[in-house]
Amino acid sequence: PDILAVSWIPRVKEIELLGYEVAAFRDGVLDFEIKAFNEQGQIIKSETKQEYFPVYYIEPYKENKILLGLDMSSNPVRWQAMENAADSGLPAATAKINLARDSGSLQRGFGSRVFMPIYRKAVAISNQEERRNNLVGFVSLLFRASDTIDLRLKTLSAIGIDIYLFDKTSGLNSERIYFHPSRTRQENIRPLEEAELKDGRLSWVKDFDMAGRKWSIVCVPAPAFFSRYYKTWQPWIVLAAGLS
């Protein structure tokens, strides 16, 4: 996926906070302070905690400097992915997030963050407890999957296919995170839910892992697909009927 931002998110104990603020000041960040997400997803000044995971470095800087000091562990969606990464030692992605809240620039739509855990060097780590004790912080990537899909589709001819991307990690209700209506459509259509797509519709489905999350891409023929390929399919349908 196309990366919108790269961040370094250290693990900061309360007693270490002053040292980080002084270091940030020396690096030219004069107003560095720890911030947090409130329940409405707005960024506010953080309450005192025993431990923080603030954004300390970020690129591109100019568009995202407002995020410096933002404690990523203050949001449940991000914290869940961070815990998964820290405990497994593997990259872990968040569920769908609103890019307008997670990016300093005016990004539209939805995306995801991937957290990659960093541990102390020269320390043998073999279990979850040792990973937690030796966690230094995270490298985080912010991306929007739709950018990559849209870019790839522009290089292909429009043949009449609607494309869906679902997050099925919860195992209960899948969440639609992307929809690309066929460029052959002349009218706007309502995106369908995964259960509706399974209701007797012809479709191609591919499940795959995305940094610990279970994603599924579903391709469904639009009316133009059948119009274009009807003459090609008809002989095979007649033949199949004759052999049955």
What is each of the regions a protein language model found here?
Residues 243-244:
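Juxtamembrane or sensor-core-proximal signal-transducing alpha helices
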